[in-house]
Swiss-Prot record:
HAMAP family: GAP_YihI. It holds the Pfam family YihI. Coiled coil: none annotated. GO terms for biological process: ribosome biogenesis. Residues 1-80, 162-188 are annotated as: Disordered. Transmembrane segments: none annotated. This is Der GTPase-activating protein YihI. The lineage of its organism: Bacteria, Pseudomonadati, Pseudomonadota, Gammaproteobacteria, Enterobacterales.
Length: 188
């Protein structure tokens, strides 16, 4: 036996006069119709028939009225079937320059060039004025002076320390004079 439907009760917690609208339950027929519609929509979720082969009708509806290129068609540039004697000069890449060997200077020329180097002169003047050079300048001075020494040795030129030579000669003269005179204490 079926029991009779109960009468809806009012919401006890809500104040009177603010009743919520009553929801109407859907009938079985309405539920079945909605289910059929959902199933129909789900069934047709893919591309329409022929979408893969008919490129014209694909996703670009109404964007432009001009006829768009078919992506399946390749280039329309004619391919020459016979090799002609005159071929268009294609832009040749610039030839890579080989390491150009600079003409070597003779040792005399290189030595003269290094001795007349303005940068070296300026740096040596700064060193004479007791200035401290940075690493790059100091390395340049050291390398250049080492090269000058090597070239002078190669050419057989001795470093002219005139002061040392003069002092040696004076000492020899002094010794000879002392020997000729006798005892140096006697002269005073």
């Amino acid at each position: 036996m079926k029991q009779p439907n109960k009468a809806p009760r009012a919401n006890i917690a809500a104040p009177k006069g603010t009743a919520t609208p009553k929801r109407r339950r859907k009938t079985r027929d309405e539920l079945d119709a909605e289910a059929r519609d959902r199933k129909r929509q789900k069934k047709h979720s893919g591309n329409r028939s022929g979408a893969r082969t008919n490129v014209e009708g694909s996703n670009k509806k109404g964007h432009s009225q001009t006829q768009e290129k078919d992506p399946r068609v390749g280039s329309k540039v004619p391919v020459p079937l016979v090799i002609e004697s005159q071929v268009k000069a294609k832009s040749m890449p610039k030839p890579v320059e080989k390491n150009v060997v600079k003409p070597r200077l003779t040792p005399e020329e290189e030595l003269a060039k290094l001795e007349n180097d303005e940068r070296l002169d300026a740096l040596l003047d700064r060193l004479d004025n007791d200035e401290v050079l940075n690493k790059e300048d100091q390395a340049y001075v050291d390398l250049t002076l080492d090269r000058i020494d090597a070239l002078m040795e190669q050419l057989g030129i001795e470093l002219g320390d005139d002061e040392d030579d003069v002092e040696r000669e004076e000492k020899q003269e002094d010794i000879l004079q002392l020997l000729k005179r006798g005892n140096p204490k006697d002269t005073f």
